Amino acid sequence: MLRLLQIEYIKLWNNRASKFLIISYFVLLSLIALISMIKINFGAINFSLAEQGFFNFPYIWHLNTYLAAWFKLFLAIVIVSMMSNEYSNKTLKQNLIDGLSKKEFILSKFYTVLSFSIASTIFIFLVSLILGLIYSDYTQPSIIFSNLDFLFAYFLKLVGFFSFCLFLGVLVKRSAFALGFLILWQIFEGIYFLIFFYKISPAFYEITSKFLPLNSMSNLIKEPWSRLSAIKTAANQIGANANFDYHTHWYEYVIVMAWITIFICGSYVILKKRDL
């Protein structure tokens, strides 16, 4: 495993674009901390995100994993480019000539996906922990380390999304077309929502949409805003229901794990049958 990872990181670190995107990704993740500095002073209105409970434990685990997931496209570009470069630079063929099997080749890419996901999860854990210890009103260990399941959901969401990008990179060969296909698939799931939710049956959509790849990954971390006490108070005043189930159910984990298996095995099958 370490040998395969070393091969991939040598390739990535010698690619200036990949290096820039990886560094930019972690810089953007660290900028989440700057949210704590946002203060609005407008006449008699004094508003601070930190004072509104944004960084209270255990809510911060939910909020930061939700926000950080939006930046995953940076690493997605790296992963798609990583695969397309293997074809354009003919390093894939050279690796196979040098004795690397096709199975080991796909595993090296999957290990890279796992390492990116693990590093990102650890980074978000540390950033959230520091922000929480500084701003949270609750510092009891039992509260601090509750709701850590959001970190696992975040990790699995990244692995699923990056595995999808890897599959598209193997399938399409060109990074621009692979990213274009990713955007088209997102549009398809949006159209699926509009047709089935509004035109056919909301109940049918709720059942079937759980199995769509991007939607299933999105379901791992629901929106966190309605958990804020200010939002709940406002909702109760207008008679709206603000009590939602924010946690991930076991079957939602299983669905994403199934897609990860499909994407990685599919990548291997395509590579095995393709004439290089």
Where are these regions (language model features)?
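Residues that define the loop-to-transmembrane-helix transition and helix capping
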Residues: R16-K19, K103, A176
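Hydrophobic transmembrane alpha-helices of multi-pass small-molecule transporters
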Residues: A33, S117, G190-I191, I264
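Junction motif at the cytosolic side of a transmembrane helix
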Residues: V254-L276
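Central hydrophobic cores of alpha-helical transmembrane segments
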Residues: L21-F26, A178-E189, E206-F211
